[in-house]
Amino acid sequence: EIRDLADVEVNFDGITYAKGASVLKQLVAYVGEEAFRDGLRAYFAEHKWGNTTLSDLTRHLEATSGRDLTSWVADWLETAGVNTLTPVLETDAEGTVTSAHIEQTAVEDWPTLRPHRIAVGAYELQDGALVRTDRWELDVAGERTELPQLVGRTRPALLLLNDDDLGYCKVRLDAV
């Protein structure tokens, strides 16, 4: 509960603002830039000079993106904690990926597994430098999200989850 400005100063710090910015960036990635922009235009046009609620905004974003944001709002705005994403790759003797997925975990005190829209980058060493050779976006949902894009390919030198920093999550590197 926030009773006065002193409570605001105690509850809103650099971490809060940074997380807020990251959650907004995640929302843009989740609904898509064009849908987000179109939703904001419709929202501002309908509510100019008026007061609004969060549901007014999400209604417009749902209409332009086609995504139901009810569970997204509950998971991202009404729960604490941060999820950890870990890539799990298996390869054969030649280094070809035979299976690949992302494991999502949460801490025991805040067990919510959130939906994430992230970019995944595959990197190779070229002339002594890491160079991104492939990138794709995908939705991470639940405990396990498959990465079929990697199966049948040579294991990359680096597989970077949340490449381009679209999501608010901890990222672990694979075991290699």
Predicted regions and their residues:
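Non-catalytic accessory/interaction domains
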Residues: E1-R3, D13-I15, G20-D38, A45-V176
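Active-site flanking loop/helix segments enriched in acidic
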Residues: D7-V8
